[in-house]
């Protein structure tokens, strides 16, 4: 990981060089980009798998142009069979992440969904000890517990009647069953995103940005198309309004957001980028409250639970 350029020391204050500012500007733009994901998905009337497929398809058009212009596709010649297998696995997990998380937004609030899906750093910290032989410390387990408590509060906030109604809701009865289903799908989205990150991290160590996202986004696109065919989800034709939403998801959350953060990882410490990702629930919740088509204001319990999830995730991700 490269370091930022050294700034000469002088007695008078001087502006930060543009070369140093650029990664932070990209990171700020990326945060804005990913914050639009949940509100745009909520505004779409298409099936969750269809949204994911078109989002990836539009993204791949731009990725393909970047690969052809920059010649990054040549890096694929050096890939081993295990690399291709890993890329396919990461792509499938990304497809499952989009499917489960997109679906969660049909059942639960934007605030609850984005808070729960951002448990992924906690999940990574918890399973790293078993898979990567990087056991979590006692302090990390404490903050993992805090995040889990926050997730439980978010779930209870979605159930009218609180703890007494949780049993019937889990059995599919009562008004809270739909919200709990959405919360569960958001948690599955966090698990699949954590797996996508852990598997893809190995590929990113020896693959440049565009070859990496080209492989993984391509595998995810194929997986989404196959899932659409298997579930008979209508891929086409789509009305202009939906196509505009799909293009917005590709340009904002996908390319500006996720790809911008992948670029920033080469210029900034990983923990800085990870902390920025955890700003998504704040941005998404504000947008969901302000956009006329959604106008969704979270309740106090959701805010408290979400704050615990984010605090636990931030501190559990640090060693």
Please give the residue ranges for each predicted region.
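C-terminal-most transmembrane helix of multi-pass membrane proteins
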Residues: 4, 56, 156-157, 242-244, ...
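Specific alpha-helical transmembrane segments that line the substrate/conduction pathway
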Residues: 50-61, 102-135, 140, 144, ...
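Glycine-/small-residue-enriched transmembrane alpha-helix faces in small-molecule transporters
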Residues: 1-54, 59, 66, 89-96, ...
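Specific transmembrane alpha-helical segments of multi-pass solute transporters/efflux pumps
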Residues: 33, 72-111, 116-117, 153, ...
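Hydrophobic/small/kink-forming positions within alpha-helical transmembrane segments
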Residues: 32-35, 57, 91, 95-99, ...
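Hydrophobic transmembrane alpha-helices of multi-pass small-molecule transport proteins
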Residues: 63, 67, 127, 136-159, ...
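Hydrophobic alpha-helical transmembrane segments of multi-pass integral membrane proteins
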Residues: 21-26, 50-69, 142-149, 181-188, ...
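Helix-helix packing/entry segments at the starts of transmembrane helices
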Residues: 113-119, 199-221, 254-290
């Amino acid at each position: 990981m490269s370091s930022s350029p050294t700034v000469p020391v002088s007695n008078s204050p001087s502006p930060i060089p543009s070369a140093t500012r650029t990664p932070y500007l990209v990171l700020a733009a990326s945060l804005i980009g990913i914050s639009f994901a949940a509100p745009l998905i909520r505004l779409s009337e298409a099936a969750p798998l269809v949204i994911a497929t078109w989002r990836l398809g539009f993204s791949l058009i731009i990725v393909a142009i970047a690969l052809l212009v920059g010649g990054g596709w040549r890096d694929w010649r050096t890939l081993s069979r295990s690399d291709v297998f890993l890329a396919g696995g990461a792509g499938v997990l990304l497809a499952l992440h989009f499917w489960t998380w997109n679906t969660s937004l049909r059942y639960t609030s934007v605030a609850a969904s984005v808070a729960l899906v951002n448990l992924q750093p906690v999940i990574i910290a918890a399973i790293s000890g078993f898979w990567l032989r990087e056991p979590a410390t006692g302090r990390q387990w404490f903050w993992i517990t805090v995040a889990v408590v926050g997730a439980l509060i978010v779930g209870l906030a979605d159930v009218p009647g609180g703890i007494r109604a949780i049993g019937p809701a889990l059995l599919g009865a009562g008004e809270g069953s739909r919200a709990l289903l959405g919360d569960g799908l958001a948690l599955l989205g966090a698990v699949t995103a954590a797996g996508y990150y852990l598997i893809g991290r190995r590929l990113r160590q020896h693959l440049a940005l565009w070859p990496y996202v080209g492989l993984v986004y391509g595998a995810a696109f194929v997986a989404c198309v196959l899932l659409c065919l298997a579930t008979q989800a209508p891929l086409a034709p789509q009305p202009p309004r939906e196509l505009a939403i799909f293009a917005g998801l590709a340009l904002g959350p996908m390319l500006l957001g996720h790809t911008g953060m992948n670029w920033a990882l080469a210029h900034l410490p990983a923990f800085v980028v990870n902390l920025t990702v955890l700003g998504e629930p704040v941005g998404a919740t504000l947008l969901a409250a302000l956009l006329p088509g959604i106008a969704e204001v979270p309740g106090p319990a959701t805010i408290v639970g979400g704050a615990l999830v984010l605090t636990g995730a931030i501190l559990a991700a640090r060693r």
